């Protein structure tokens, strides 16, 4: 069955306008109505539903409310739609919070990992290899006793 996906989406909008008006509806409900309207067979449903769902998600006429409910944007007040869109795309709060500007700060060099592992904190004159050699000598002297 060769149905144009645009026809499916545009018909879904017409169905939603007539049946649901300002009431929320589920995707399953609108899909069943589209199937009924176009007399889509059970065999053809699996090949059509995926693309229809993708187009449904991308269509700005359908607004997701959460809890698997949708609503037509035409029946929403601007404040209601704006609140939903702001909650989905929280850009204002993230970028306006006071973050410290680190771009011009001079970063102090940290103690090297090797120095930390070897126990060299810079206070003595022993190198890491001298410390290791001392540990090896201590372990051999303990074994020989």
Curated annotation (Swiss-Prot):
Coiled-coil regions listed in the entry: none
Q: Does the keyword Nucleotidyltransferase apply?
A: yes
Annotated ranges, domain HTH HARE-type = 6-75
Q: Which PROSITE patterns does this chain map to?
A: HTH_HARE
Source organism, top-level taxon: Bacteria
Instruction: Enumerate the Gene Ontology biological process terms.
Output: DNA-templated transcription; regulation of DNA-templated transcription
Q: Which residues form the signal peptide?
A: none
Question: What Gene Ontology cellular component terms go with this record?
Answer: DNA-directed RNA polymerase complex
Instruction: Indicate yes or no for the key word Transcription.
Output: yes
What InterPro entries does the record tag this protein with? Asxl_HARE-HTH, RNAP_delta_N_dom_sf, RpoE
The record's listing under Pfam families reads: HARE-HTH (PF05066)
Q: Which GO terms describe its molecular function?
A: DNA-directed RNA polymerase activity
Alphabetic keyword roster: DNA-directed RNA polymerase, Nucleotidyltransferase, Transcription, Transferase
Family, per the entry?
Belongs to the RpoE family.
What quaternary arrangement does the UniProt entry report? RNAP is composed of a core of 2 alpha, a beta and a beta' subunits. The core is associated with a delta subunit and one of several sigma factors.
**Per its database record, what is this protein's job?**
Participates in both the initiation and recycling phases of transcription. In the presence of the delta subunit, RNAP displays an increased specificity of transcription, a decreased affinity for nucleic acids, and an increased efficiency of RNA synthesis because of enhanced recycling.
What is the protein's given name? Probable DNA-directed RNA polymerase subunit delta
- Origin organism is Mycoplasma genitalium (strain ATCC 33530 / DSM 19775 / NCTC 10195 / G37) (Mycoplasmoides genitalium)
Q: Gene encoding this chain?
A: rpoE
